[in-house]
């Protein structure tokens, strides 16, 4: 009886006896849980590292933007031109040595970019079919600090700027052919002009001033071109006599203004002399800033003979600061 009770056939084994037939499971229970736990740890480390990198990248980008923006300052003001109030703005970018002036809005907007690094000024009018460039002195714009920003803002913000707009001032007229190679222009001027053709501007004067200049030339030229001996060498002098009505500042042989000594000056230094006032960079006798406007016109009836007959004149304005202010900025006094 005891032998029969110990030996149980496999066919008679019930559901309760299955655990006695299964192999031991303790060997697999210690290996399987380790693999997903390790993956979770690696994933957590990757996520934390990525978050830290993003945080440092955001902080670096913020400080880079803040540092680059510290070299740029914007100010808005109001000017009165012929009894009409117009809004204007000035942007000083000391890092790129640029000044940007905007006047008016909509169809009457005019934008001028003064590139002091290359000695070029770009001008564009809203709705115009041309973009203009003219000679500009080469200089270095001093960095504008926080104290200076407050000084400029207190002088310009919320005030009506006086406008210097003389009838006897220079009038800039576009030449007949656009610029073929614009590689010498900065990216800011090219961005301003876009796809528009670019034309050089040449200086001229109103007819009354031109008559006075011609009278002076007629008195001077005969004494300077007279030669003691007649011959073939006197022909160039006669040629110059035929062109005596052509103002010397309107020569086409040079792209830049020949009366401007700064284009021949190397380096980034700016000399404080009366030409700064003459060229409209700053005002020597002024104690406050003002708005300086220039007329830009299209020729009427062809480009030759001189002097120009012009039409369709529009104004481009900029803010002129006292020369003492610029010198103080260069010396670090303000």
Curated annotation (Swiss-Prot):
Bifunctional growth regulator that stimulates the growth of cultured chondrocytes in the presence of basic fibroblast growth factor (FGF) but inhibits the growth of cultured vascular endothelial cells. May contribute to the rapid growth of cartilage and vascular invasion prior to the replacement of cartilage by bone during endochondral bone development. Inhibits in vitro tube formation and mobilization of endothelial cells. Plays a role as antiangiogenic factor in cardiac valves to suppress neovascularization. Glycans are attached at residue 243. Residues 104-201 form the BRICHOS domain. The chain crosses the membrane at residues 45-65. Detected in cartilage and cardiac valves (at protein level). Detected in the laminae fibrosa, spongiosa and ventricularis layers of normal cardiac valves (at protein level). Expression is decreased cardiac valves of patients with valvular heart disease (at protein level). Weakly expressed in chondrosarcoma. This is Leukocyte cell-derived chemotaxin 1. Keywords: Chondrogenesis, Cleavage on pair of basic residues, Developmental protein, Differentiation, Disulfide bond, Extracellular matrix, Glycoprotein, Membrane, Secreted, Transmembrane, Transmembrane helix. Residues 211-214 form a propeptide. Residues 242-257 have a biased composition (Polar residues). GO terms for cellular component: endomembrane system; extracellular region; membrane.
């Amino acid at each position: 009886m005891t032998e029969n009770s110990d030996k149980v056939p496999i066919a008679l084994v019930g559901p309760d006896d299955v655990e006695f037939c299964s192999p031991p499971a303790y060997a697999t229970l210690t290996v399987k849980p380790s693999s997903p736990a390790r993956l979770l740890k690696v994933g957590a480390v990757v996520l934390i590292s990525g978050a830290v990198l993003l945080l440092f990248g955001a902080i670096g980008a913020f400080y880079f933007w803040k540092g680059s923006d510290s070299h740029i300052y914007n100010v808005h003001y109001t000017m009165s031109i012929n009894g009409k109030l117009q809004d204007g703005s000035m942007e000083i970018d000391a890092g790129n040595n640029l000044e940007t002036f905007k006047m008016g809005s909509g169809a009457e907007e005019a934008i001028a970019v003064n590139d002091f690094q290359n000695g070029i000024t770009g001008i564009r009018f809203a709705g115009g079919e041309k973009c203009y460039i003219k000679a500009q002195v080469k200089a270095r714009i001093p960095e504008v600090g926080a104290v200076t920003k407050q000084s400029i803002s207190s002088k310009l913000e919320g005030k009506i700027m006086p406008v210097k707009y003389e009838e006897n001032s220079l009038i800039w007229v576009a030449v007949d052919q656009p610029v073929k190679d614009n590689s010498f222009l900065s990216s800011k001027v090219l961005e301003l002009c876009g796809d528009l053709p670019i034309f050089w501007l040449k200086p001229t004067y109103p007819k009354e001033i031109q008559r006075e200049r011609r009278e002076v030339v007629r008195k001077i030229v005969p004494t300077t071109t007279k030669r003691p001996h007649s011959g073939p060498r006197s022909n160039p002098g006669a040629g110059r006599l035929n062109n005596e009505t052509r103002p010397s500042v309107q020569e086409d042989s040079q792209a830049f203004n020949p009366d401007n000594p700064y284009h021949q000056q190397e380096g980034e230094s700016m000399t404080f002399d009366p030409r700064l006032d003459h060229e409209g960079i700053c005002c020597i006798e002024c104690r406050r800033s003002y708005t300086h406007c220039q007329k830009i016109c299209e020729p009427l009836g062809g480009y030759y003979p001189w002097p120009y007959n012009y039409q369709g004149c529009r104004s481009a304005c900029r803010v002129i600061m006292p020369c003492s202010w610029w010198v103080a900025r260069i010396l670090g006094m303000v």
